[in-house]
Amino acid sequence: MSDSDREIIGLINNFFLKAALLLEQCKVVARGGGFDGEEPLRDGNHLFNIETRGDPTLEAQIQPWTTFDGEKSMPPLVLETFLDLRGLHSNQTVYLHDSDGNPWMVCKGGKKSEIVLERWLIELDRQFSSTTGSTDAAEDDEYNEFNDPENLHKQLVLLFRYLYTLTQLLPANDIITKLQASQQGTAQATTTTGTLKPLHIHTRLLDGSKPILSKGRVGLSKPIIASYSNTMNETNIASHLEQRKITPIKTKFGSLRITVSYRKDVDFYVIDQEDPYKRTTNVSALQDTVTATDRRISSNSNISISVSPKTTNMLNANHIPVDSSGGGFARRQSISSKLQPFKVGSVGSGSFVQSGSLQSVTNPNPSLSRNVSSSSVAAALKVQRGSAGSTVLNSDLPPELSSVGSGSKYSSSFGRIRRHSSVRRSESIDRTAKPRKSNETPPEDLLEFVKLLEDKKELNMKPSTILPQQDISSSLIKFQSMKPNNDTLSDNLSMSMSIDQPNMRMGSNSHSPIPSFSPNYGSIPSRLSQGSRNNSNVELITSRKSSLDRHRLSLLNRTGSNVDIRRGSVGTMETTNEDSKEDEDSHVHGLRFNSGTVNDKTEDNNEDDDEEEILIKRSSNAVASSTEHFSVSPRSARSISVSSYTRSQLPLKHPNFSYPTTSATTAHAKFHKSEVIPDQLHREGSHHHNSSHKNDEDDDLLFVMSDMNLTN
């Protein structure tokens, strides 16, 4: 290995050490005039023209990155800058102001140990290496530049100057400046607030080749402000972060790179909620803040003031800020509002204070109420939690007669939280309130949920209260509009079922009363009536036989035609009983007469001619009378309407096809044209039905009378 290579390796090792020392000493606030145990570096404090102090602890931690020999690979060096929260108590809460000045609750004391502010990545990228040299003459100059230690040193000097400047411009430097100013006024801060500054800035070295965990702390990738939750910028970096890269320096063994990712919003502050009545030494400063706030509220005509026992807002007197003005520690006064998105109190339950008029301040923890944007809901809930009671401002009462109003009661579906704070302050201003119990505070899950609601800038709760009523009204109107249609349908069906009743009675041998129909559709019985079936069998058989004989003889002599007995389905009866085959279907059959020449076989019946002529006249009159009132299918001589039969009159087929059966059933008929369906069974059944006549007349004509209405 040549001397130039050894010098380059030494510069690379010093690069890692100097960068770590510079970043740590720029971020850590000096305590007592210097760092504990500081020692000068062996190579001096002015390496790369940047002054740094020696730190043996850091040098021991960074040893794996300062022992590069030119052969082994070096893992990336990660240096994190974080805000240490381990000094917070359980009654202290950390908040963050966004760019618009809205407070966002970060965590309560004891919940998280730290908040990561910056993450620096220092590495030697071995992907680019010029150890093999160059064979092209045009690249000799570039190759020599990479292998020149003096040139590399100059580039590193410029890099560290830029690095130091960058550390002074990052947002975390603002916190460091404020902490330094607050430590200079520690005595004054202790007198004013009764507590020391609990926040500190620290750094940590990590191995970049290992995963970085964020358990128990607020990691860099976690957005605190909800508006940054689901947005990404063009560089695929979370919108609450920004990234800066320093131009890499190429060497013979690789490229030296420095990259930083940091939070844009770092305006953190702490609210102490332990003893609100103890902080009374600086009441005049508080009143000045209230007066300035009153002026701000009065100048805005869109802001209304309202104070309610169930909705109280506090002006917290004890903000422990991370900033200060001048040489002293100035307390941060802020007005935060508490909203209740899940519960609305009664209109007349609270005291009314006129807008723009705040004339009395009763204690160091007064209550101001105003309309605020939805982005302050989360922080306002936490501010509400820290008060033992809220003062109802009343312009008509003097400050010494004012009393603390009843405390807020915050309840929601996410948990049971009851607050009891009804304190009368008429006895003494210096009276100490009891510390609040930790279990009376709202859970962080509820506050995190409220943060999710901040995606919408404006929440209008009025439409949501009207929507259910509109849905009910729309449903009722729609239901009422269906009633006339239902009545019309019922009337039309009733008329269609009863229009053919008189005509059917003229052509029927039934003596049953006129059937009546109801517009209400009754349920279809599941079983046939056994009593109706048994009582009607005897009379049905006798009546059908006599009627069949007379009609068959009269029509046979009159037309002289061969009648083809066919069975057509006019309607279909549907029942709901699937257990019995007897009540599955009830068909109404029609007749079709086919014209044609047939043999006249009535010559053997000369003795009945006179009687047949009378029957022919009666039959023709019945047919003419029936066809005058209703239209029938072109393919049928008669059409018998199903609607003319009542429930007890609908005939059903017997399983043996010997005797017709009638039973009571409710059915809805579907009317259509009759179709011709030949039925051989009825032809065969006609032999049994007409056994008393001659053999040559038995096969001529058969009236299917199963669709006629016969009474018991």
UniProtKB/Swiss-Prot annotation:
The organism's place on the tree of life at top rank: Eukaryota
Keywords annotated in UniProt: Autophagy, Cytoplasm, Phosphoprotein, Protein transport, Transport
Modification after translation: Hyperphosphorylated under nutrient-rich conditions. Starvation and TOR inactivation results in ATG13 partial dephosphorylation leading to ATG1-binding. Dephosphorylation induces ATG17-binding.
Main localization category: cytoplasm
InterPro entries: ATG13, Atg13_N, HORMA_dom_sf
Annotated region (ATG1-binding), positions in chain: 441-500
Ranges where the record places region Disordered: 388-443, 568-611
Compositional bias segments (type: Acidic residues): 576-585
Family to which this protein belongs: Belongs to the ATG13 family. Fungi subfamily.
Protein's job: Activates the ATG1 kinase in a nutritional condition dependent manner through the TOR pathway, leading to autophagy. Involved in ATG9 and ATG23 cycling through the pre-autophagosomal structure. Also involved in cytoplasm to vacuole transport (Cvt) and more specifically in Cvt vesicle formation. Seems to play a role in the switching machinery regulating the conversion between the Cvt pathway and autophagy. Finally, ATG13 is also required for glycogen storage during stationary phase.
Misc: Kluyveromyces marxianus proteins are shorter in length and have a more ordered secondary structure than their S.cerevisiae counterparts, which might contribute to the superior thermotolerance and solubility. K.marxianus could be therefore useful as a new model organism for further elucidation of the molecular details of autophagy.
Protein name as it appears in the record: Autophagy-related protein 13
